[in-house]
């Protein structure tokens, strides 16, 4: 989105793979992102939604996987993803104490969408992930409401904002402002270009550890600035999308490489950090009402996975930096 400079606009190039058109998760065809931001004296928070497809994700599910690097988190929906290897819901991000109401809103939205298509829902697995924004936001107010989720869904676009928007409004990263960031990479396989995209909700890390393009700049910053934390209490949610044909097992292997990008920026995955990766591939569709007993799933040659691993790592690193560099100053409620 025009107006905000991203990390590459400052001459900092992350990695070596080519980037997508927008250099965002939405470079994966069909993916859109929407925000609703709450910015009052008491509350600096919101909700961000990732729509995996322009169609009905419940009726036509995608192959999916999750990985918990450090489990100090309250993300809803990972158990079924791990068991079945499919995604049947939009993905919503919010603050820790608003997971319940956002979960309810995603259920209501999906029921209504399916009702219009004469699809009956008896079981459904919403995906709602969170980070704790209580440093800047009076989190006990639980300011996010169902109508905010619906508005974020309605406003979802390809070229979405980053920084202190939506769920990222009250987030902090390396003791500086964090929030929503994204990046994408192009991978060539069998002469065809595929896309890997990442969106992060960054809320983690110490200032002294902040590293950009291999250079530790955080140590000098920490010496000059006061009020930085000594305990890593934050989290990061990483959503990884691709159009590469992957099985759930292969996708899980790939999304683990987000940890490489995290480490490159200086995260040490502290005790109080919830580091959650959620991934999906748009290449294989699993029909909700599939009549066949046996279905075919396309998969990638295992020996060629290294480029996918590299793409995820590069996207994660750049997405975190974009989440910080695009964020505006936010004054908390305290």
Where is each model-derived feature located?
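Alpha/propeptide regions of enzymes that mature by internal proteolysis
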Residues: 1-334
């Amino acid at each position: 989105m025009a107006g905000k400079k991203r990390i590459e606009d400052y001459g900092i190039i992350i990695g070596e793979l080519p980037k997508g058109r927008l250099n965002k998760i939405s470079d994966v065809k069909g993916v859109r992102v929407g925000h609703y931001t709450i910015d009052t004296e008491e509350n600096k928070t919101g909700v961000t939604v990732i729509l995996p497809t322009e169609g009905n994700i419940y009726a036509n599910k995608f192959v999916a996987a999750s990985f918990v690097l450090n489990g100090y988190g309250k993300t809803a929906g990972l158990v079924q993803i791990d068991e079945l290897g499919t995604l049947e819901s939009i993905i919503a991000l919010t603050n820790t104490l608003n997971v319940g109401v956002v979960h309810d809103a995603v259920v209501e939205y999906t029921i209504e969408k399916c009702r219009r298509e004469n699809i009956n829902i008896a079981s459904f697995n919403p995906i709602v992930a969170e980070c704790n924004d209580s440093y800047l936001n009076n989190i006990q107010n639980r300011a996010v409401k169902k109508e905010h989720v619906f508005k974020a869904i309605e406003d979802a676009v390809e070229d979405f904002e980053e920084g202190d928007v939506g769920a990222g409004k009250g987030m902090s990263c390396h003791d500086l402002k964090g929030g929503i960031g994204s990046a994408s990479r192009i991978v060539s396989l069998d002469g065809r270009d595929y896309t890997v995209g990442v969106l992060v909700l960054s809320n983690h890390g110490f200032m002294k550890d902040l590293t950009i393009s291999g250079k530790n700049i955080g140590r000098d910053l920490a010496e000059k600035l006061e009020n930085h934390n000594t305990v890593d209490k934050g989290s990061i949610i990483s959503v990884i999308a691709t159009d590469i044909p992957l099985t759930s097992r292969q996708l899980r292997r790939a999304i683990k490489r987000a940890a490489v990008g995290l480490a490159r920026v200086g995260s040490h995955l502290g005790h109080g950090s919830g580091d959650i990766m959620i991934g999906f591939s748009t290449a294989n569709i699993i029909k909700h009402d599939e009549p066949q007993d046996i279905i075919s799933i396309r998969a990638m040659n295992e020996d060629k996975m290294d480029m996918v691993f590299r793409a995820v790592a590069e996207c994660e690193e750049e997405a975190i930096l974009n989440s910080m560099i695009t964020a505006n100053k936010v004054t908390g409620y305290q």
